[in-house]
Amino acid sequence: SPXIIIDYLCVTETX
């Protein structure tokens, strides 16, 4: 995920 706030996977990447 690019890290979009809408994308929950962004939380794990930016985390």
From Swiss-Prot:
Highest taxon above the source species: Eukaryota
Textual note on the cofactor: Binds 1 zinc ion per subunit.
EC number annotated for this UniProt entry: 3.4.24.-
Record localization: Secreted
GO biological process: proteolysis
Alphabetical keyword list: Hydrolase, Metal-binding, Metalloprotease, Protease, Secreted, Toxin, Zinc
Disulfide cross-links: none
Residues given in the record as Ca(2+) binding sites: D7
Cofactor(s) this protein requires: Zn(2+)
GO (cellular component) term, any one: extracellular region
Membership in a protein family: Belongs to the venom metalloproteinase (M12B) family.
Protein name: Venom metalloproteinase
